[in-house]
Amino acid sequence: MLRVEQLSKSFGQVEAIKDITVEFAQGEFNCIVGPSGCGKTTLLKCLSGLMPPTGGRVALDGVTVTRPPKQMALVFQDYSRSLFPWMTVRQNVAFPLRNKGLAKSEITRLVEEAVEAVGLTHAIDRYPWQLSGGMQQRTSIARAIAYQPEILLMDEPFASVDAQTRANLEDLMLSIKARYGMTILFVTHDIDESVYLGDRIVVLSSSPTVVQEILTVPLPVARDQITTKEDPQFLHLRSHVFREIMAAQAG
């Protein structure tokens, strides 16, 4: 269980996050949305232990997070800068496992399983510069899941790819959730994406940020890009989230 308790974050006199209290249950896919500049990335950095809060706390299984926990992995938006260009896909995915005290055979197994899960077995010995943008982001995701985190944090991971690649990566995330059962916190600006992927949607207000609303997504677990997005429940929830974000922008 990841719990955020009265979290606040200020930069000098500027209050970015005012007061956030929310819980994230094991195995839940949580999408975090809100107006541009509302502090979504700042919140994610506080949750991951990369940035200390000004007030309140983040607790993982009852223990206050003061540094990046071993149970967490983070996937960034800029995949091109998160991969080592001199390493192959195999080597990039294996990199964070080197200090876990695992046998070489176990590292090989975890790497190959993660690469297979993201559909890159055929490219496992290629370098990042030999991959498309979507394949590079798949490599970043493989590296995160090979680490076997309890919680996967993702900061607008599909913002820099084209629409078709984005749809493919969204479906990849649904398969990863089903396969690994990890808790996922997924920051996005894309309302359709939040409804399509999420078990819950956390809507943030404009800055200084509070939780404006938490919505449960009533869609079936099995989803696809056409049928799900034509579902009246999908359309209704998308409109509701859009109205909430517009209201937040208006103050």
Predicted features, each with a name:
Residues 48:
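Helix-to-loop junction immediately C-terminal to a conserved catalytic motif
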Residues 152-155:
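Catalytic Walker B motif of ABC-type/P-loop ATPase nucleotide-binding domains
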Residues 98, 105-123, 175:
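Conserved ABC ATPase "signature" region
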Residues 146-150:
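A short, proline-enriched helix->beta-strand linker immediately N-terminal to the Walker B motif
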Residues 56-68:
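Conserved ABC transporter NBD signature motif
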Residues 33-35:
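The feature captures the beta-strand-to-loop junction immediately N-terminal to the Walker
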